[in-house]
UniProtKB/Swiss-Prot annotation:
DNA binds at H91, R110. Keywords: DNA damage, DNA repair, DNA-binding, Glycosidase, Hydrolase, Lyase, Metal-binding, Multifunctional enzyme, Zinc, Zinc-finger. It comes from Streptococcus pneumoniae serotype 4 (strain ATCC BAA-334 / TIGR4). Belongs to the FPG family. This is Formamidopyrimidine-DNA glycosylase.
């Protein structure tokens, strides 16, 4: 599933491929992906110019002439740009045709991805309604606010980090990596964390996601960037998908449990429950 680093990588790729292009027509083969009014979506997009790209958490943002297209890739969503006629592909569901003859294609094997069209003035309200936390940066991710939110919750720290309210952009892969680096057990109730542990999680969230952006994201199964290239962050994972291997820090065998319905990897020695 694309998490913040993967979405940021897609965003940066699309910036190089489609900025300034004018949409001539749109073709939607799976209408359920469009979560705002379908007729308005089809009517408003032609003649819009893609002015810039952006990202908020795991949401990809297309800033158009007077609209914003919000795209969530969910589990398997991908964008591919074809300068000429694109090939017929089984899992291609939305086609943005440009005046210069190019086409941007949205592909999604699972069909879980979503698209919404808003006026820019409603963007802040949209993300407030999603209860989306701050971006994982030094400027936006306030440690004291984070500690205060943890102190009020009995949720397991992994589940809490995944719900996007504490900080935006973490998913299953990077939560496991952050908690391993911070040496915190994923099932620990949030309110039991010490100030030192909360600080470690805060700092490692910024560090891990920053490193993952630098490495172009993680390719575990099918993720590729807008150029069809794999990321390399998977080569730097220390715990995710390492079940049965030795912890590089202490030599203990990495274990996998189910937590909140999610496969969860941790070191039982470095990340003690009590």
């Amino acid at each position: 599933m694309p998490e913040l680093p993967e979405v940021e990588t897609v965003c940066r790729g699309l910036e190089k491929l489609i900025i300034g292009k004018k949409i001539s027509s749109i073709e939607i083969r799976y209408p359920k992906m469009i979560k705002t009014d379908l007729e308005e979506f089809q009517r408003e997009l032609p003649s819009q110019i893609i002015e810039s790209m952006g990202r908020r958490g795991k949401y990809l943002l297309f800033y158009l002439t007077d609209k914003v297209l919000i795209s969530h890739l969910r589990m398997e969503g991908k964008y591919f740009y074809y300068p000429d006629q694109g090939p017929e592909r089984k899992h291609a569901h939305v086609f943005f045709h440009f005046e210069d003859g190019g086409t941007l294609v949205y592909e999604d094997v699972r069909k879980f991805g979503t698209m919404e069209l808003l006026v820019p003035d409603l963007l802040d309200v949209y993300f407030i309604s999603k209860k989306l936390g701050p971006e994982p940066s030094e400027q936006d991710f306030d440690l004291q606010v984070f500690q205060s939110a943890l102190a009020k919750s009995k949720k397991p720290i992994k589940s809490h980090l995944l719900d996007q309210t504490l900080v935006a952009g973490l998913g299953n892969i990077y939560v496991d990596e952050v908690l391993w680096r911070a040496q915190v057990h994923p099932a620990r109730p949030s309110q039991t964390l010490t100030a030192e542990e909360a600080t470690a999680i805060h700092d490692q969230t910024i560090a891990v996601l920053g490193q993952a952006v630098e490495k172009g994201g993680s390719t575990i199964r099918t993720y590729t960037n807008a150029f069809g290239e794999d990321g390399s962050m998977q080569d730097f994972h220390q715990v995710y998908d390492k079940t049965g291997q030795e912890c590089v820090r202490c030599g203990t065998i990495i274990e996998k449990i189910q937590l909140g319905g999610r496969g969860t990897h941790f070191c039982p020695n470095c990340q003690r429950r009590d």
